[in-house]
């Protein structure tokens, strides 16, 4: 589920680097995106916490998409790239279109663009990241990171459905100083989704992470299976300001199996050894997972070897000398740099489907925080009845506006 053999280890020399995005694909640098996400965060301990989000495990229904996201999508000029079709684990395009062409630039065909993060600069810099969390083994991994004082040196690309079903694990990662990023809502092949479905997969995951992390807006995302093309890139960056993160080497830890013809812990560790104990000095951005005990075991075995061989371990943002979040600098306790206003908090009660709402209770609790993080004002609460679907609720958090987005697009 979490990988496929056509995306095995990528050689630097085999990867086709395409030109940077045409400027016309992206939203204007002075565009106001602050209205995309604005609302107070729900309490993850509350019994109705899950009702604030789409159901986990599948792509959110387009009816759940806030209108502000769709309005922003409508302003983004997208490249002329068709929606792909899943074909035995490899997305294919209609009319015999070549996924490696620069117009499409699918990473499935080992093509990436200049704006993608692929291999970190600097000698012996390991950009440490883990996909697919939080899972049952995540707390053990987070303990190991903390014991080795490297919690803040890891980026966790989290799945939205996992976030809302295991919010306490996310909070542990946040408290320890982990860097949080987006791995979509349900781990689909993104190039096979419509534009609106891509928006839903990314936006709701950003929403869930920001709600738990003090309004900090994720700045990075990694496509499941590495499945991204120029259409999906343009939506991610044009609508949400997200930077696409890929990898220069696949550890294949996701493929570990007891079957004799599959990868084993020993074989994955042997390949890992060639990366961190050999003569390589160029930076590493590996595909690794917090998926099960095997993936955690591989990392815990290889990390000491890397350190002993002079590797410097950093999270993705630090490895590329970039800030952690769209609206905050470095760390989970750094000041949120844009003005933030918590709007109406609406509790949705699902009825017969995961995307319809029969009734809602709205509690308004507005507050304003200045650039120094000082609370300026708060408003009283009120309750009222409503029958809004999720898509019509006020947005949930403040995303970085013009200057923040411009900074990452330079």
From Swiss-Prot:
InterPro entries, A to Z: Glyco_hydro/deAcase_b/a-brl, NODB_dom, Polysacc_deacetylase_ArnD
Lipidation residue positions, type GPI-anchor amidated serine: 385
GO molecular function, one term: chitin binding
GO cellular component: plasma membrane; side of membrane
Origin superkingdom: Eukaryota
Annotated Co(2+) binding sites: 132, 183, 187
Biological processes per GO annotation: cell wall organization; chitin catabolic process; fungal-type cell wall biogenesis; polysaccharide catabolic process
Primary location recorded for the protein, binned into one broad class: membrane
Reaction(s) catalysed by this chain's protein: [(1->4)-N-acetyl-beta-D-glucosaminyl](n) + n H2O = chitosan + n acetate
EC number: 3.5.1.41
Cofactor(s) annotated in UniProt: Co(2+)
Positions with a binding annotation for acetate: 131, 225
Keywords: Carbohydrate metabolism, Cell membrane, Cell wall biogenesis/degradation, Chitin degradation, Chitin-binding, Cleavage on pair of basic residues, Cobalt, Glycoprotein, GPI-anchor, Hydrolase, Lipoprotein, Membrane, Metal-binding, Polysaccharide degradation, Signal
Signal peptide: 1-18
Active-site residues per Swiss-Prot or TrEMBL entry: 131 (proton acceptor), 289 (proton donor)
Outcome of substituting residue 219 to L: In strain: CAP 67
Glycan attachment residues as annotated in the record: 61, 80, 149, 279, 293
Membrane topology category: Lipid-anchor; GPI-anchor
Family as reported in the entry's similarity comment: Belongs to the polysaccharide deacetylase family.
Function: Hydrolyzes the N-acetamido groups of N-acetyl-D-glucosamine residues in chitin to form chitosan and acetate. Chitosan is required to anchor melanin to the cell wall, for maintenance of cell wall integrity, and for proper cytokinesis. Chitosan offers an advantage during infection as it is less readily detected than chitin by host immunosurveillance mechanisms.
Protein name: Chitin deacetylase 3
Species, as recorded: Cryptococcus neoformans var. neoformans serotype D (strain JEC21 / ATCC MYA-565) (Filobasidiella neoformans)
Originating gene: CDA3
């Amino acid at each position: 589920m979490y990988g496929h053999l056509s995306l095995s280890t990528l050689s630097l020399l085999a990867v086709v680097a395409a030109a940077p995005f045409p400027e016309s694909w992206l939203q204007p640098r002075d565009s106001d995106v602050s209205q995309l996400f604005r609302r107070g965060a729900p309490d993850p301990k509350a019994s109705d916490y899950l009702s604030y989000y789409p159901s986990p495990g599948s792509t959110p229904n387009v009816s759940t998409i806030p209108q502000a996201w769709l309005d922003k999508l409508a302003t983004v000029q997208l490249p002329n790239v068709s929606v792909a079709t899943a074909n035995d684990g490899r997305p294919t395009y209609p009319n015999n279109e070549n996924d490696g062409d620069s117009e499409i630039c699918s990473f499935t065909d080992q093509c990436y663009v200049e704006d993608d993060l692929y291999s970190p600069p600097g000698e012996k810099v390991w950009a440490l990241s883990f996909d697919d969390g939080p899972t049952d083994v995540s707390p053990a991994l987070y303990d190991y990171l903390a014991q080795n004082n490297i919690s803040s040196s890891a980026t966790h690309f989290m799945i939205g459905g996992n976030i809302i079903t295991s919010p306490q694990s996310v909070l542990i990662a946040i408290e320890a100083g982990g860097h949080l990023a987006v791995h979509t809502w349900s781990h689909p092949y993104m190039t096979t989704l419509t534009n609106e479905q891509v928006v839903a997969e990314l936006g709701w995951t950003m929403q869930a992470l920001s709600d738990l992390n003090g309004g900090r807006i994720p700045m990075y995302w990694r496509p499941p299976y590495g499945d991204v093309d120029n259409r999906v890139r343009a939506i991610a960056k044009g609508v949400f300001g997200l930077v696409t993160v890929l990898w220069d080497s696949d550890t294949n830890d996701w493929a570990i199996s007891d079957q004799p013809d599959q990868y084993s812990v020993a074989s994955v560790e042997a390949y890992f050894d060639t990366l961190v104990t050999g003569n390589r000095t160029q930076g590493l951005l590996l595909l690794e997972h917090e998926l099960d005990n095997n993936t955690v075991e591989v990392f815990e075995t290889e990390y000491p070897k890397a350190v002993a061989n002079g590797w410097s371990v950093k999270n993705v943002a630090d490895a590329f000398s970039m800030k952690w979040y769209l609206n905050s600098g470095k760390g989970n306790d750094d000041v949120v740099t844009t003005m933030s206003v918590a709007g109406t908090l609406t509790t949705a009660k699902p009825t017969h489907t995961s995307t319809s709402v029969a009734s809602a209770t709205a509690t308004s609790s507005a507050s304003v925080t200045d650039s120094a993080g000082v609370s300026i004002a708060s408003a009283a609460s009120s309750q009222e009845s409503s029958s809004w679907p999720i898509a019509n609720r006020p947005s949930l958090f403040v995303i970085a506006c013009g200057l923040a987005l411009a900074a990452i697009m330079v």
